[in-house]
């Protein structure tokens, strides 16, 4: 023990010959680092205690340890702390742990060797005014009961959580569609044990670091007596990935019939080898609902399947507890619940490819986009931030040139301007002249009627497929007003660099700008601020629908169907040049989703969806699932006509191999 540490102990009337040593790294269980508090997570060190350097004065350390005590702050009475400073030999420092942290660590070590055969003392309140009858049939005996001893040990180590009346009743968790087309072994629902199973637990989980205990689940079937069929509720132990096979029925399970009137209740136990789970722990007991016998409806036929709805409700089990209280604003290192990826009203939805409002959804076999698309690792394969603002470039030209390469002045990827659009031109162009839009007979289209009734629209414009930008163009000595700019990603070619060729990969040499910058014979450098306003691709298919024209740096993120769920684009539109019309734009994400994924680390397994229920003004609804790559999926094959505005609500986490639920009303005609 160093002399400083020994002298500090004298002030507490402790024997300085005692060697009080400590290693705070033992408070933080990190398998990949042996010194996490000095290496990977130094910002967490103040949560465990106070650190002093050994070259500090012993009296100064003593006074600081007293002044930091809550007793001094309230009464100004100097009280020696319960735990004195100790020697942290590996770091060469003096460390004083918080008493609660040290006690939690010591009791945790004791509880690790807990003997479940020891007698327990049960304390119960004598107030029986809060009661809740069990409205259902309790099923038990098929699985091991939760360990009350483990729960008691966890409480002793971390503190008792708050009791409340919400623990006594079942709360809605989700609903599952069960149709006559689902075959035996089909998984309809899968959810890992954890606070996400119950809305109250999910809310309270924001105040804690860890949890433990079981959850009771109640199933209700909305079918009628004409139905036949059975479902199996299966308890899958940690570490096992559910598969769509009847082999899953070898695990503990209970059966419930489609004709059953009373709900079925059973307990989902917490099978664990530790005192508690951190909020990041997804390897827990799983609840799986699987088709045991096919659903039968004698009034259905091959052309028209029917079904019923299974409602899932939950409440915490008697042994469920939260542990390790934390301030609400503290961020956990493992990630948070993905409950805020879609705004609650569609009035706030704009695309991540263009900034107009989302007006529809488009189901496609494949969905792809690199720029401004983010995944659950906060990563993007693109070059733009999740916001829309003017693009900033400089352009150097001479000899009267109007076509040049922009140099980025605002960027996150060197050389590529932040916000640069992500599609290329359809073919080789020599930008010049005016718009040239004709019909099938070669006549110019000059009216709305002529455009809407044209059997063929030919776009012979020499700058077609480029984006139209309002421009603030400045150059020293240039007194003329700014002109409209046309921009794209392409390669510059030709004898006088007057030709551009399409290219779907981007770098600093492909930032093409077509604009009259009033350039003479001498070289002129213009500072350009460009606001994206329109598009010259008159008569083209939707922007972003052609994979070969979508620009990427190197990798193009892409997805296809998953488990009967289809990927979707979010559709909005951009104004066309010349004709007073618009063209559709396909977006891989709502811009709010892109922004949230870029700013926050969310917790989502790669085999699961974060599910949101979308409801239109007529009451039709369907679920959208967002996977860990940031793409969106639906379980329907078509939407029909949705009545905007739409509303969105977070439904929880669902296995990606399970078809997403929907209830879209058929269009009705009144004679």
UniProtKB/Swiss-Prot annotation:
Q: Which InterPro entries match?
A: Calicivirus_coat, Rhv-like, Viral_coat
Pinpoint the site Interaction with host receptor F11R/JAM-1. 479-480
Determine the domain of life of the protein's source: Viruses
Any one GO CC term of this protein is: T=3 icosahedral viral capsid
Residues at the site labelled Cleavage: 124-125
Q: What keywords is this UniProt entry annotated with?
A: Capsid protein, Disulfide bond, Host cytoplasm, T=3 icosahedral capsid protein, Virion
**According to its UniProt record, what is one Pfam family this protein matches?**
Calici_coat
Annotated family: Belongs to the caliciviridae capsid protein family.
Supply the name of the protein: Capsid protein VP1
Q: Which species is listed as the source? A: Feline calicivirus (strain F9) (FCV)
